[in-house]
């Protein structure tokens, strides 16, 4: 199963790279990101529509009719519309989330930004959030956009995720390591 997931991720990155290059040439990369995010949100809100768009048992014709209705409503630029049609034609609509995530990374990278996910056992004060943002900006040399979530099971400390890097300095992990050391 892992091989399939890695394969899909690689394909999604290829689609995202090609789309990002075209969007950059047309100077509409931010627009593409926003339009894909909008469609992605729509699919997340409607499990029935999501299932219809990704199911191999639903005909391309039915999927194209559905996407045409969406395109008439949302009126995205031609590149987004054609890209969504291409995903249908190639039976790759299931990759939309990965492609959209990769597009966000490309846009952020070009703008000198990085998305950082932080898990904490309890809410951080605004001053701690500001210090954390500054520290991460100093380390990465980029503007940091934090997504903070509370995870009481961490007990203390932080878990920080930046792209493929994870720093786990949670009390839960420290206690687990101590337990392993004591086992021998």
Swiss-Prot record:
Q: Does the keyword Transport apply?
A: yes
Instruction: Please report a single Pfam family linked to this protein.
Output: OSCP
How does this chain sit within the bilayer? Peripheral membrane protein
Lineage, top-rank taxon, reads Bacteria
What are the entry keywords?
Answer: ATP synthesis, Cell inner membrane, Cell membrane, CF(1), Hydrogen ion transport, Ion transport, Membrane, Transport
Report the GO terms under cellular component: plasma membrane; proton-transporting ATP synthase complex
- Which family does the similarity line name? Belongs to the ATPase delta chain family.
According to its UniProt entry, what is the function of this protein?
F(1)F(0) ATP synthase produces ATP from ADP in the presence of a proton or sodium gradient. F-type ATPases consist of two structural domains, F(1) containing the extramembraneous catalytic core and F(0) containing the membrane proton channel, linked together by a central stalk and a peripheral stalk. During catalysis, ATP synthesis in the catalytic domain of F(1) is coupled via a rotary mechanism of the central stalk subunits to proton translocation.
The name this protein carries in UniProt is ATP synthase subunit delta
Q: Tell me the organism.
A: Magnetococcus marinus (strain ATCC BAA-1437 / JCM 17883 / MC-1)
Q: Which gene encodes it?
A: atpH
